[in-house]
């Protein structure tokens, strides 16, 4: 009888309800802390998922769309000006069960070469040594494809990926492409990612939003979770796209 009850409880979380659970879970995101240096980040005992990518790749818009909050992740009007690592907590109030890390954009910063190099080193150190790092979401503009800096980042994290670190390449601004162009971009990115997971994403059309939310939830809850673990009926919020999303910027 006990086994039947347990099986029934596990079966009650269907793929559809799991996606809804994941979307509601993402909506619990709130600001946790910010740091200008790696050593200033507090150690966390929960899964941490990092969002990385070039400036103008739509990273802030992606985070705000996934969490259904307009201004959770700050998007600077000048690409590359955001130079802090920002952490956002997920889970019920007083019960954090995962962290999202928003890393500074790279490749377009209107700052000095020394500052660029410093931040590239900070990011590399974070990706290589951050304890608790469970997954990485690399955001790319599919109209530009993966740049040399994106490929360099892949090389930095490859040893950890081979050890089990989760990795997703997210092609943002999918609404700018036709279906045929999306299919081509996916094929190219999959080759560049060395067989890693690749998905299309559009904040404007909400393409891939539920799918990505569910994937991140699975990364953070490998043994599953009960439907009562997160609030329900999270309201969907229309997130404004970043002002620089109309045309791709060339890497510097």
Can you say where each PLM-predicted feature lies in the sequence?
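Switch II of P-loop NTPase G domains
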Residues: 41-43, 81-87, 98, 104-134, ...
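Residue-level signal for inorganic ion chemistry
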Residues: 88, 172, 212
